[in-house]
Curated annotation (Swiss-Prot):
NCBIfam families named in the record: PRK05710.1-3, PRK05710.1-4, queuosine_YadB
Residue positions of motif 'HIGH' region: 17-27
Protein name per Swiss-Prot or TrEMBL: Glutamyl-Q tRNA(Asp) synthetase
Top enzyme class: ligase
Cofactor: Zn(2+)
Keyword vocabulary terms for this entry: Aminoacyl-tRNA synthetase, ATP-binding, Ligase, Metal-binding, Nucleotide-binding, Zinc
Entry binding sites for ATP: K246
Length: 314
């Protein structure tokens, strides 16, 4: 008797830029990797605008980013999700966490946390929360933000690029904020709710977000959500060798370039940065043609792990 095989669910990837500045080559690398890794498996590729941090959003930048993607030859599936319109969904998730005892109000200021912290931290500006409000707000304290209770056990997962991961959240960050003192929902909660709502199964993004992944996995588990597969691609370094910033205008995609004409060249450079070997005959090809090649030939195992500069020409 022949037993029919169970159909595999479709791969759903996404690219989620923040409209706080124009796309730069670091954004391009993440977009190419997420696009190729979804399309190579016949999957969907979604675009989401992470415009949650409204004070930092540049007016008109979301549309500028979409135009840039179109000029480069990207095509996406479905409507654009915008985080700025999803406060109700984030609020519902927060209420679920509070009702289950997984989250709590916090009345601490940053200065109070810094004074109370006794554990050493890694110097990146983040101090593990010293649990001042974990058992309830002290007398006279008003809630400023909301935090999630992180588990004592480490969070482990395997990243498709960076390999096995082991993160001790209590030592790394402690109970982290999921709704900020300014009333905005935190990125960690919003992205988890959005990935679940869109059915995202594969998250491909820059290595600067690797430390966010264990936090998001904790939230997924507490909310009963599925955990996507993660792949964190190496960062593009700026002129000084550090992480590329949106302030590095020389590496902006739109800086003095005709993207319709030069898009293919930039995409080929992004593919080479990602360890791929596009054929010589693609030199001078359109962006759409280069992306078609990437969709059929991208090899995730070739992606390097180390940050490196971006070279637009071979």
């Amino acid at each position: 008797m022949c037993v029919p095989s169970t159909p595999q669910p479709p791969v759903i990837g996404r690219f989620a830029p923040s409209p706080t500045g124009p796309l730069h080559v670091g954004s391009l690398v993440a977009a190419v990797a997420s696009y190729a890794m979804a399309r190579r498996q016949g999957g969907l590729w979604l675009v989401r605008m992470e415009d949650l941090d409204t004070p930092r959003v540049v007016p008109g930048m979301a549309d500028d980013i979409l135009r840039t993607l179109e000029c480069l030859g990207f095509d996406w599936d479905g409507d654009i999700m915008r985080q700025s319109r999803r406060a109700d969904a984030y609020g519902a998730a927060l209420q679920r966490l509070l009702a289950a005892g997984h989250a709590y109000p916090c009345g601490c200021s940053r200065a109070e946390i810094a004074r109370a912290a006794t554990a050493p931290h890694d110097g990146d500006g983040e101090i593990p929360y010293p649990n001042l409000c974990r058992r309830g707000l002290p007398p006279g304290k008003e809630p400023r933000s909301f935090r999630v209770r992180v588990p004592a056990e480490p969070v482990e997962f395997t990243d498709l690029v960076m390999g096995p991961q082991h993160h001790d959240l209590p030592a790394m960050c402690g109970d982290f904020v999921i709704k900020r003192a300014d009333g905005l929902f935190a990125y960690q909660l919003a992205v988890v709710v959005d990935d679940e709502a869109q059915g995202v199964t594969q998250v491909v993004r820059g290595a600067d977000l690797l430390s966010s992944t264990p936090r998001q996995i904790v939230l997924q588990r507490l909310l009963g959500f599925d955990t996507p597969v993660y792949a964190h691609v190496p960062l593009v370094t700026g002129p000084g060798g550090g992480k590329l910033s949106k302030r590095d205008n020389a590496l902006s995609l739109a800086a003095g370039r005709d993207l319709t004409r030069e898009g293919g060249m930039l995409l080929l450079a992004a593919l080479r940065f990602l360890g791929q070997s596009p054929p010589a005959e693609l030199a001078g090809a359109s962006g759409a043609r280069v992306l078609r090649w990437a969709a059929g030939n991208f090899e995730p195992s070739a992606i390097p792990t180390a940050a490196a500069p971006f070279h637009a020409s071979p």
